[in-house]
Amino acid sequence: MIYNNTYDVIVVGGGHAGVEAAAASARIGAKTLLLTHNIDTIGQMSCNPAIGGIGKGHLVKEIDAMGGIMAKAIDMAGIQFRILNSRKGPAVRATRAQADRVLYKKAINSLLNDQENLDIFQDSVDDLVVENDTVCGVITKTGIIFKSKKVVLTVGTFLGGKIHIGQVSKEGGRAGDQPSNALAARLRALPFRVDRLKTGTPPRIDSRSVDFSVMDVQHGDTPTPYFSFFSKGKIEHPRQIPCYITYTNSKTHEIITNNLDKSAMYSGLIEGIGPRYCPSIEDKVVRFAEKDRHQIFVEPEGLNSIELYPNGLSTSLPFEVQCEYIRSIKGFENAFIMRPGYAIEYDFFDPRDLKPTLETKHIKNLFFAGQINGTTGYEEAGAQGLVAGINAAISIDSDKSWYPTRSNSYMGVLIDDLITKGTKEPYRMFTSRAEYRLILREDNADLRLSDKACELGLLNKQDQEIFINKKTAIDENIAIMKNTWIGPQTQKARDLEKFLDKKMTRESTLFDLLKRPELDYKKLQQIPDTNLKLEDESVIEQIEISAKYSGYIERQSKDIAKISTLESKTIPESFDYSQVKGLSNEVLQKLSEQKPTTLGEASRIPGVTPAAVSLLTIYMKKTGFIK
């Protein structure tokens, strides 16, 4: 049957990409349907019970700045918060939160249920309705046809999913869930490049069988940080609890080495490539044979759960081997495994077949987001879901689009890397992937992106007000500091001497004084009549960073301005690269296959040389494609 409602946007899949896509689309005002095989698993943390980390925390803050729900959900569900790299510079500081799985899922569902323009329906999607290379709906397992103007696929590891525990394999999208084999077959029949990837999860351990007294304790930060720019004073964190640290040892490694032939990964049972930066324990033992131990983070799954997640012990070894090596680890001598670890292999589609909006190049109005694009991690999935949902919604009645860039966000770095370079292994975000790290900090994600979120209708009125007030306070107080002068012979200068390494020798503004490493805003506040009255720590932080890193920030801003010239030069989708004289066959093939949308994107395709970009630019100027 054909369902009588036609939707603007249908999102298939209720994982971390799906919920952000559906929420973003609905916030913009599009009539949105979220289709999931099981309503009870919406927002489920299928792997580790945590959000954030190096590079990943930046993505969460950016999702939040664009009105997304991940940061607010973890603020409602986080049971331990830490700022990583807190002693390093602001560019690489990152927030990480341990989650209560049940509370996180509950928070996501609460945020979705409060969202207008959003319907949720339980059924698996088996087929797409495609007419003239344009998607116009989906067909479910029960035969219901849902019509829509746009479709966003956020299907995670469910496409042709296969679970491996030792030499035992079974079909599954994750433990306890059936795979989406019919949809996988349908997508394979379309003109997309497809391959296989692998990821894994560790065994879960009964906390009552663990000796925590022999492990290192890891407490969260005090005061407890917030992930969302809009949570403080509105959301109260749950009770905070510690995590623990233990280590593998030579006996652990010996057990694993002696049983490698039984591992699904090493026996050849798994074809897909696993994540380089989150390897299985057997992979770590083989690749880092010189190490005599590996760190294991023992993470609680929730305030009312007895399950522990031993982060660092992902495996595809047989269950009996898992039991043996787990019990060789300090504190786990009597451990009882409640759920075995496993590897999962699944289809992904070459992200080079996507536009920067995450719409597919071959099928109009069809968007891909999350693990279907070859990424790993909740945060990477959420960022893609947000971008896909935005573009699906704003392009319903126009050619309007918006996508992040390398110079304004880690989301932009993520998507640009995927669509220009593709990936052969699960892609994980790191700060090292970004060229403009000092500008793309966690702390200023709202200042970088929330103006655009307001413009697109993604922020509610309350959050808009919080953002505008913060931005105004920063601008006004920087202006005050740049216009307040202190001379070397004044009383204010003498008051400052107790803080200074050396006396003032010339007149300076308060802003210039703030550049000195020995001074901060609160010290300057102690000087009488400076008119510095701020108490908001987030505003003070922005002012201090603006002053202390001003030289570096200005330099990166100039670099961005140079690059933006190429980014602003768009290339028509129908552009014929064979007309550009002097391009090598390799460059011609790559440009013709990938169809970059801008000269900047073309310049980042592996194998496309600066000389080739120059030839392309000259030709486009000559023929009037660019002015």
Swiss-Prot record:
Binding site residues for FAD: 13-18, 125, 180, 371
SMART domains documented for this protein: GIDA_assoc_3
Keyword terms: Cytoplasm, FAD, Flavoprotein, NAD, tRNA processing
One GO biological process term: tRNA methylation
Cofactor: FAD
Disulfide bonds: none
Compartments, as annotated in UniProt: Cytoplasm
Protein name per the record: tRNA uridine 5-carboxymethylaminomethyl modification enzyme MnmG
Native organism: Francisella philomiragia subsp. philomiragia (strain ATCC 25017 / CCUG 19701 / FSC 153 / O#319-036)
Underlying gene: mnmG
